[in-house]
Amino acid sequence: MSEQGKCPVTGRTAVNPVTTGGMSNRDWWPNQLHLDMLHQHSSLTNPMGEEFRYKEEFKKLDLKSVKKDLYALMTDSQEWWPADYGHYGGLFIRMAWHSAGTYRTSDGRGGGGTGNQRFAPLNSWPDNANLDKARRLLWPIKQKYGRKLSWADLMILAGNCALESMGFKTFGFGGGRVDIWEPEEDIYWGKEVEWLGSNRYSGERDLENPLAAVQMGLIYVNPEGPDGNPDPVAAGRDIRETFARMAMNDEETVALVAGGHTFGKCHGVGDPKLIGPEPEAAEIEEQGLGWKSGYGSGKGDETMTSGLEGAWTPDPIHWDMGYLGMLFKYEWELTKSPAGAWQWKPKDVAEEDLAPAAHDPSKRVPTMMTTADLAMRMDPLYGPIARRYYEHPEQFADAFARAWFKLTHRDMGPRSRYLGAEVPAEELIWQDPVPAVDHELIGEGKIKELKKRILASGLSIPELLSTAWASASTFRSSDKRGGANGSRIRLSPQKEWEVNQPEQLQRVLGKLEEIRNAFNGEQSGGKQVSLADLIVLGGCAAVEEAARRAGNDVTVPFIPGRTDASQEQTDVESFAVLEPLADGFRNYTKRKYSVTPEEMLIDRSQLLTLTATEMTVLLGGLRVLGVNFRQSPHGLFTNRPETLTNDFFVNLLDMGTEWKPLSKEHETFEGRDRKTGEVRWSATRVDLIFGSNARLRAIAEVYGSDDAQGKFVQDFVAAWNKVMNLDRFDLS
């Protein structure tokens, strides 16, 4: 082969460019377990450094000054991307909405909490066309405030300021969103291989979980109607399903659609074939901008974005009742935009209900509605809500303010994480509130006393560990929900979940409540312990006792300060999505799924912020301690149960055992002595993956070594403590 054109360092040629690097391991073995999602967003990719604390930097931010600059930007039209109607408000509302609107309740992923709109795939989704310009318009403000203001916060704040600058009173703003510096690898956006593909439905129109959007590359629904079919009633069904999966009820949905579409316009004046590639596919000289249009100037009145064309209201840069007024005042006729997209025009529209041309106020042009907009009138449930809002403007304004706040803050977790002077005082149930600490906390002496009482109560090590794990492991790093604080494991719906073994759970909680009540009754000076703390403390005591039985004297860290939420503070429907479909740490699977149990283990571990090493040591420890669902023997590779040993790894790696599947599905297995044929162990896929997967086996070998017992216990305690405190935002 000729040496010409070959890289002197890598040896790659033009047919093997550095951008692809040839076949990857995942290309060769596409079913290989994806462990990289456990090691995202490390200090190696973060230019801010390990010591950077955004919370502390945000406290130094002059929020009023930032907002003043944002208000000024709204009407500071730039020649390279001029503002519609001389005001960027509509563009920034769309940017903020699309930043937050990727959130879905099923796994808590998506949303505006990380600034992920800056990276692929979101920066190049068809539904985010030309939002790259919105972020470039914000760059001078981001540049000015630097480390004190994250992109994630700035994008949401810009949406708020856009609304406020056009006369709307928002509900508030909480900062604290921390930027990421690389694309998120843990989010499943769908299996389609083409933009706007919709291979995500089964049955009559059952949307695949955990997805919320109807097509690949859309935030919500297709505005032209389901799969481009302009049927407003059918669109209403899609909207209801999609918005419900984004935590919105019907009233919130109508408020968001009607409120958001009060502002701005759509762009579709020319041939969509003239639109250039998205940012990730654009040429290097475009400097990260995409969708360069060859239609006229490609900007201003010649802008191409969605293919729809026109404003919704006669006055697109002021808060008013224009959207609902137009929706109910006119009958609507199906038509097509100049770009060929289905939309609707008002019949016999009055002169005063025409909108100004976006870049020539001397011209008046018709408004429009999308098929999705007409669902707000024609859907049998949305219609009455929309009419009520139309007849009660103050109710509409309040509903939109609250729904917008929920949209832009739903993925931030509890209210205690919000930063800044504009955090609303009102506590909202979707924030999963927990009471403030109103008593003196227990100290080291009382902690030791309570541990002794718990261990003397007759509760077993597996019972204590299972209860503590069930309480804490509901946490999701995605939207910061769940966790042990609040002791919601004693409330509906968690107390009824199959994985929590309700009968055993009630017995354990009853015993712990007896201990708590007796202890609290004996105290003076207001010192108390919450059940939430006692549940975690019981798990810590069990770990210490199990380690002692193995000959290791350890103290598991414990910091009191959790409180007990009430059933009234707990939205049962909202918490239902936290129920584990599978929990590999308890060897539990609710039913058979299209993904493997080991893949679901990785997914849960990622939500618990566990590394592959932490996941491995935790699972191996929990197996020998007997935490399995319904005391299943699978993976119990020890003759010393309830003792914190490294036996799981020692016996898993023993070549004297030969494994065979017990069914053609390869879901459960039997391990027999190679020489005698005697059954030694049974296992699930989740157990055997730690010997099968090369990366996990390498970690298992560390803990299965002869000198590993001490390190195993130390690492198990550290990982256990991490999970128990994932929701302790008061400590971070």
Swiss-Prot record:
Catalytic-site annotation from UniProt: H98
UniProt cofactor note: Binds 1 heme b (iron(II)-protoporphyrin IX) group per dimer.
Enzyme Commission designation: 1.11.1.21
Post-translational modification (record): Formation of the three residue Trp-Tyr-Met cross-link is important for the catalase, but not the peroxidase activity of the enzyme.
Residue sites binding heme b per the record: H261
Catalytic activity: H2O2 + AH2 = A + 2 H2O; 2 H2O2 = O2 + 2 H2O
Cofactor entry: heme b
Family annotation (Gene3D superfamilies): 1.10.520.10, Peroxidase, domain 2
Transition state stabilizer, annotated site positions: R94
Pfam families documented for this protein: peroxidase
Crosslink site: Tryptophyl-tyrosyl-methioninium (Trp-Tyr) (with M-246): W97-Y220
Top-level taxon: Bacteria
SS bond list: none
Record-linked PANTHER family: CATALASE-PEROXIDASE, HYDROPEROXIDASE I, BIFUNCTIONAL CATALASE-PEROXIDASE
Complexes and interactors: Homodimer or homotetramer.
Function, as annotated: Bifunctional enzyme with both catalase and broad-spectrum peroxidase activity.
Protein name: Catalase-peroxidase
Organism this protein belongs to: Pelodictyon phaeoclathratiforme (strain DSM 5477 / BU-1)
Source organism phylogeny: Bacteria, Pseudomonadati, Chlorobiota, Chlorobiia, Chlorobiales
